[in-house]
A protein has these predicted regions:
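Active-site capping/gating regions of soluble enzymes
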Residues: 379-381
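A conserved active-site cap/scaffold subdomain adjacent to cofactor or substrate pockets
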Residues: 352-360, 371, 376
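Gly/Pro-rich active-site capping loops and adjacent beta-alpha segments
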Residues: 387-389
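Conserved phosphate-binding catalytic cores of ATP/NTP-utilizing and phosphoryl-transfer enzymes
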Residues: 95-103
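Conserved "HGTGT" condensation-loop signature of ketosynthase/thiolase-family condensing enzymes
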Residues: 2-88, 102-110, 114-250, 254-257, ...
Length: 501
């Protein structure tokens, strides 16, 4: 069939998708998992595409890290792509790669791109720190790096011991709760309602989802021995789970190459538009801990490019590492968080499973399958990196993009966002009173409150990060909402502490 006029020759199109969820008792190497997902994507597109792959791009593997993963995957597949790319930390990576490498396809610098990633978090957990099998020999070639490699936290957050996403996202949640006039208990109840539909979606994917079980709002929000409090207001079932053995892959190529290779038209799904924008990079510097301007910019640009509004979108997969990420995305999109279209096509990171930087590859794989089934509909995928820091958004449809493939520049908006960042007081200047902007209480595995990190501002507007290790303060701040209240800072010598007045 000759190409219809509506598809320009260099339009990027996804023609093959594959995923693997490995449930055995054995240990699997992430490279082996990735290769299996890639083979499935090749089979989905038709064997002819394999020898034409000129670029392999791999989101960074976190739990059992492998150096030069793209080169290792290519060698295991016995293909020799000209470019092998691996990426730094960022859950937005797969959608970001669609944008950047789709751009290269559009400009004729790449023809056939394999994006593939994996995590063996479940294997790692079973190994409990023992080395996985044998360390593989080094690959014959090395990867180039693509993406923003800055760390996710500044010295201000690190100085009080904040380091993990599960400690930082609840701080955003407290700011969201306070803005809606809720305390932690009321917020936790609401989050059960928000997340229950995600579990129902996961249950519809028994082959893929790590936890394919539908749960009620109460099951999710009620604190029990099985559902222990992790960091207020998130019990365990509201947290992303990375200890999964999963891989996903998709093949992106120029439309003219897909035609030349005879890829059946019913395989074709187009990225319509793609945009990336960061929030103010470090959480401590963000003027509003309860909102994301980066998602708002990226999503608005992507929708405008497709000449669509949010009402035109049939499916969403909003990045769901923690509930606050979903709430911020829904608000940025002007979307009711309980919209009956649903906010996920997979079940999300807590229930489908959150395989590190590669989760969005699973979103894209499932979105492609839906677009193939309903070719006139459009889906929207968001990906997010670090602490609601880096945002990549894309539109997807089996209908060719009516405006052509659109790469979107967000430089002007990015400069505006960056210029809104707040100053941060040095440790020696963090004295006197401060007003709490966001906080959480971190619990231990026995259900006892352990410590309380806060992000607050001084009378002059500069931000501070402080912590208390007093269990009574933790108890008090868990019982009542402290966002907007005053605390007294004190220098502990090594970090900024605080007390209640």
């Amino acid at each position: 069939v000759p190409m219809p006029m509506s598809v320009e020759a260099r339009t990027p199109v996804v023609v093959g998708v594959g995923d693997v969820t490995h449930r055995g008792d054995d240990f699997v190497d992430p490279i082996d998992l990735a290769v299996e997902a890639a083979r499935r994507a090749v089979k989905d597109a038709g064997r002819a595409v394999e020898r034409r792959i000129d670029t392999v791009a791999t989101p960074g593997i976190l739990v059992i890290p492998r150096d030069n993963p793209a080169s290792r995957i290519a060698e295991a597949m016995r293909i020799s792509p000209a470019r092998r790319i691996s990426c730094p930390v960022g859950g937005n990576t797969p959608q970001y790669l669609v944008e950047v490498l789709g751009g290269e396809i559009g400009e004729g610098r790449a023809d056939v791109v394999l994006v593939v990633g994996a995590e063996s978090g479940h294997s790692a957990r079973k190994l409990q720190g023992r080395a996985l099998l044998d360390s593989p020999p080094p690959p014959r070639s090395s990867d180039e790096s693509l993406g923003d490699a800055r760390p996710g936290l500044s010295q201000a957050e690190l100085s009080v011991g904040l380091s993990w996403p599960h400690e930082v996202y609840p701080i955003f949640e407290s700011a969201i709760a306070a803005r809606h006039g809720r305390d932690f208990d009321a917020q936790r109840e609401w989050l059960g309602t928000l997340m229950a539909p995600f579990t129902a979606e996961a249950a519809r994917h028994p082959q893929q989802a790590w936890f394919p079980r539908s749960r009620s709002a109460t099951e999710l929000s009620e604190v029990t021995a099985e559902n222990r409090m992790v960091c207020l207001p998130y019990p365990k079932l509201l947290n992303s789970i990375m200890s999964v053995d999963m891989a996903a892959a998709f093949i992106l190529m120029a439309a003219e190459v897909a035609d030349e290779l005879g890829v059946a038209r019913d395989r074709w799904v187009f990225p319509w538009s793609a945009a990336t924008c960061n929030d103010v990079y470090f959480p401590v510097e963000r003027p509003d801990l309860s909102r994301s301007s980066g998602i708002e910019v990226a999503a608005r640009k992507a929708l405008n490019a497709g000449r669509l509004t949010i009402d035109d979108i049939r499916w969403f997969d909003l990045y769901s590492c923690f509930p606050s990420a979903i709430e911020m995305a829904a608000e940025a999109l002007d979307l009711d968080p309980l919209d009956d279209r649903g906010l996920t096509v997979t079940g999300g990171l807590p229930y489908h499973g959150g395989p590190g930087n590669n989760y969005v590859s699973h979103s894209i794989v499932e979105m492609v399958r839906r677009c193939r089934r309903d070719p006139t509909d459009v889906g929207l995928v968001t990906g997010l990196g670090w602490y609601s820091t880096k945002h990549s958004v894309g539109l997807w449809s089996a209908t060719p993009p009516p405006t052509g493939w659109r790469l979107l520049d967000t430089a002007v908006e990015q400069a505006q966002i960056d210029s809104s960042r707040l100053g941060v007081a040095g440790v020696d200047e963090a004295t006197g009173c401060a007003t709490v902007d966001g906080y959480t209480v971190v619990y231990d595995r026995d259900g006892q409150p352990r410590w309380t990190p806060i992000i607050a501002h001084l009378y002059d507007g500069r931000r501070v990060v402080a912590r208390s290790d007093d269990p009574q303060i933790a108890e008090a701040m868990g019982a009542e909402m402290y966002v907007g209240k005053t605390v007294c800072l004190r220098d502990t010598g090594s970090f900024t502490g605080f007390e209640l007045p």
